[in-house]
């Protein structure tokens, strides 16, 4: 295996060594290109500009070169948020490429604005572009700027792009079989799936939904549901789609959190998206948006405290302060209303709009009346099961008893209620509720019981001993079905536990456990069928007759079990009951002396018990425990969602009367029926068009009301979005904290500012500007200079020619401060430390100057500041590097006597204005001197410890003022 990595050599010293070499070598940068990228990294505007100008003339630098990290100069400027250098590079037509995507990923808003407004000038000579191969790009071809901005969820960048009217590809349906989807999947299935995931990841961005959707809440509902369904199809990316679905749910919930009044909450929850339903005046204030949330399983939205507060107010309408009452008072009130439900129902039948009729229509009263009616039905079932009315047990077709006659109206009322619910909500919505399926099964069993009793009453007359009845006698089947329906009717009462905060989570956990049991039964049935087939195959030949067994009994129900595996059905029963320990081991014996057969049978029976009891049963317990823990972790949300579904069933119009009063036609029902019959079969002529004009007027009024309601909804949504965005930005700044990136940005700002100040003070006037190829060489050169006591070591450097030579410079501030700190190299450490003690006030002034440049502070007083260079370079090294000892004494004194005000120092003056006194001439090794200056400056910048200890106060003041400005900027934009 080692031969794959190195070539075997014969000489011993390197026999146990693996020679390493770069296999995939990249093109090395030239020294000029390294210096160019280094200047961009440091923020040296003048050097970058000079390098770009020389590149246009001499072509000595490839301005599109990349560093080992694959970053071009433009990308480095974007990463450092240096907009001035970015603009300079764009003016020289550098290759843009994925710079916009890179700026969006780095969330540099200024760079995005600059790149969006950038247009390549036509007719000019352009530098050949690189990186044209998309294989080396950091972004896949399907990623667009708006998609990447949506992935980062940067509100400001998304707003900039949306204002440019960008678009996002519309994803096809989940199970779309169009030509485009099929061909894309066949060509590259991975790219097709990834592209779909990237599109949905962009569409699920809260900022994008808030900006581009007219109804962001409904959009979040539908998108969350679609992503949940897509996670079931794209199993490979199931976790990603589920995370996006949860993100949409949380966005809708967070948006509802911003509601500040009951009016805003009502406008949101009562808004309809279906215009045909909006024109119906009777359907206002029916919580349409909340119904949509329940339909799409938006549990977080439904369980939101604001939503629950409004629902509780509507639920306890007419009972102010209900929750503050004692539980005894609540119990007595509920029992009183429950006992009075027949009278309240009769009052509603007679006069629906009376006080009692309106009282029973309240949701809480309706719930109590329906519960009392169902408890009465269960009480009658209990009376029927106890046979309080004695009848002849041997009558084959017994007539109905008094209790059964009393049960019949309730059964008919239940059936009529289910028919109305299916008619109002639709068949699809009806079958999605498991309790409706249970009601359907229960009502079907009651109908089958009634039908079989009628058949037995008509067909069979007289009495006969029950022991002599045939097995499929109608009365026997009816009794069995009635017993099963009694069980289902009693269990149906569990649905009412949802209204209680203590029993509700238990009821939800029970429902989840039933799902686990169904999953478990699939595996268990497979194991059961496998062992049943094998045991039946083994013991089929040893079946005996009933007359050969004791008491003429055959099967496992006998006192002495036998023939447990003689048939397949008997084998299935035997294995099932063996799980509960109801089968003995001797059933594996045979009358013949076939010990091998008995051993194989006993081994198979034991293996089945180990698998079913030890493995499968414990797996079922673990699954049920997991389901319960999942509900317990989200007990509050799950219970509130289930309770809301229960409450919403009583908020709707209709279904006011409980069984059996709901089967009695009311006067209102006769009125509705008469109007329908009159309009359908006896249409009246309208020669004058009065009815048509009346319908047009009413339609216009309803449409106007709909527009007003929609306008109010849009105003509320606009306010919610503003509050949400403000809270999102505020939370992101709070959670961001102080990171390493902040220190890097601060260091970059200080470096750029240093070069700007050097240009302003006129210290960068030499003919040649030298740069080392790496920061390591710079630091090594500084160490060499310090140790040699002024001796200059020759090192390789790269120079950019400066076009203009100036004979005068703005140097007096620097020269006035230099003698003060000492120009000799022989100073002691104590003296040097004392000389640095006065640097604090200078740094404070430097911070004020920096704030002034950034526009966050008012301009300070324009009094002269002569110690600005103390915070820029260390005076000792500057003095040592420049070697002013070689200068003429008269010229130095003349320069030291000149004064200049810092507020008057500008870049144009530094480059174009000449002073009356000439600056000192450069030494013979001026190129090397300037390189040493850069070494000192680089050493200062690379030492983060010195920077943050010395410039602490100014940086703190700078960051404080910058933070205040950012908050004001965010508030202004919002």
From Swiss-Prot:
Known catalytic reactions: Ca(2+)(in) = Ca(2+)(out)
Which segments occupy the membrane without traversing it?
326-360
Binding locations of Zn(2+): 172, 176, 178, 181
Q: Name one Pfam family in it.
A: Ion_trans
User: Is the keyword Magnesium assigned to this protein?
Assistant: no
At which positions is Ca(2+) bound? 418, 421, 436, 439
Q: Does the keyword Calcium apply?
A: yes
Placement of ANK repeats on the sequence: 30-60, 69-97, 98-124, 141-170
GO annotation (BP), single: phosphatidylserine exposure on apoptotic cell surface
List all disulphide bridges recorded for this chain: 553-558
Q: Which residues lie on this side of the membrane: Extracellular?
A: 385-404, 455-476, 536-603
Extract the SUPFAM superfamilies matched here.
Answer: Ankyrin repeat
Description of activity control? Activated by G-protein coupled receptors via direct interaction with GTP-bound GNAI3, which increases the channel sensitivity to phosphatidylinositol bisphosphate. May be activated by intracellular calcium store depletion. Calcium channel activity is enhanced by MYLK, that promotes its subcellular localization at the plasma membrane.
Gene Ontology terms: cellular component: plasma membrane
- Membrane topology, record value: Multi-pass membrane protein
Role: Forms a receptor-activated non-selective calcium permeant cation channel. Mediates calcium-dependent phosphatidylserine externalization and apoptosis in neurons via its association with PLSCR1. Acts on distinct neuronal populations in the hypothalamus to regulate innate behaviors including feeding, anxiety (flight/fight/fear), socialization and maternal care.
**Stated name of the protein:** Short transient receptor potential channel 5
Q: Which organism is it from?
A: Bos taurus (Bovine)
| Gene expressing this chain | TRPC5
